[in-house]
Amino acid sequence: MKRIVLTAMTIAMALTATAQQYSFTFVPAGRTDTVLYIGRYYRDAVTLVDTAHAKGGRYVFKGRRDWPRGLYALVAQDGKKTVADFCIDGSRKFTISGDATLKAESVTVKGCKANSQMFTYIATENAAKREVDSLRALKKDEATREAAEAAEKRVIERMGAFEATACHPKNPNVFFDLQNACEPPEVPEEVEDKNTYYRMHYWDSLFAAPLGTLRPTLLHSPQLFSKMNYFFFGMLYYAASDTISAEVDRLMARIGDDTALARYVLDFIEPRYFRSTKNVGWDAVWCHIASEYYLKGRCPWALPGTITNMRYNYNRIKQSIIGAHGQELWMADTNQSADPNDWISSHRFPTPYVILWFWDPDCHHCQEQSEELKKLYDGMVARGEKRFEVYAVGYESDVAKWKRYVKEHKFNWVNVGGTNVNIDYQEAYNVHGAPTMIILDWHRDIIMNKVLPAKNIMSFLDEYEKKQGVVREY
């Protein structure tokens, strides 16, 4: 037992001996926090890793530790709000002073060239932005427009030269290394499809960087998270699911065997596509990510339980994504016949479209949406222009209540419900709440799996037919 204790003590002493002594002092004038923290970034989270208590307006973090080179956050006493970012790069003893928020223009740095350069860069950028903003009003006035545009051009050229010098690869500074690795692409003037070019070259700067040495720094930087988050949930927010899935594949192909970077990306985007209930097509993107990466064993970090749950959800969701063939339901109508020969099919209507409407008479939102859908349906029938049938499934265990509601509100479409049904429609169409809307086309393939306001249904069908090159004959 003594040998074990001595061995543990020896290891601890060795680790302490190899760790570097550090002293990081922050002097934010007028700040009243009793304590500040140092936080380390990872994706959209900041983990608190060190603490300093206020003494005479100074916050001194000191001790022995191996600090990885990178960008860190100085965090307020609430443990959430970032006061300012700073570098740990080379120097292990420095002082950063400034106003209460350490605004870049107010900051002075002693003992750390990297931090001095970073705050100077940010202050210069901020000043240039203020110059450009001040010229906006002048550009609107015809009398001053030409001079304002010329002045703006000079500011942009000046900043371009400044950035080229500051961010030059020969300038060893972790902040500039991160800026270069996450720099957006420049689109040549002669390129016609600028949006596509920008998207196709979006990740070039990252993979031009020396990932072997820079990877740990990148993974713990706000720059990489911002770049990734903007790409998937900014640029591609309204993109078709096929486009998003293709971009996931392109990025993962470039990442290759870099497990740390693959995990950084996939474990961030996967749950966000999974949880989305409003974005059309995101469930298909999630199914693609799940099937191509997690379920094929390409995510070695994923726990067995995670994979089991993902496989269950994948098998459940894939049946109702856009493009899947809708499963045919046979259900009893309000007569509630137990004879399957009397049941009504969800597919066998002469109309080119079928709207599967899963609703609950006790659901206020269902009531409102059903009334709007009824107005659209009745008006369409009255005009003799029946583009779709509504196959309304009563999502209610109290059959008598459901039948009474249908009768009182004069729902003249196809009303089905109860337990007389050929398959579990909740599993077939991923119905786990009401209302749920599924629109089937003439092949009875799913073309929409989100609830559309009734006023938007006709325009959606028009747009769908336009994309399919269909000429209406009804």
Please provide the spans of the model-predicted regions.
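Bacterial Sec-dependent N-terminal signal peptides
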Residues: 1-27, 474
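A non-transmembrane, solvent-exposed segment enriched in polar/low-complexity residues
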Residues: 20-173, 177-209
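Structured, charged N-terminal subsegments at the starts of enzyme catalytic cores
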Residues: 196-260, 266
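N-terminal targeting signals for export/organelle localization
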Residues: 242-325, 474
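N-terminal "domain-start" segment that seeds a small globular fold
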Residues: 301-346, 455, 459-469, 473
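Short active-site neighborhood of thiol/selenol oxidoreductases, capturing the structured segment around
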Residues: 342-373, 389-391
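Structural microenvironment flanking redox-active thiols in thiol-disulfide oxidoreductases
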Residues: 367-407, 421-427
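Thiol/disulfide oxidoreductase modules built on the thioredoxin-like
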Residues: 421-463
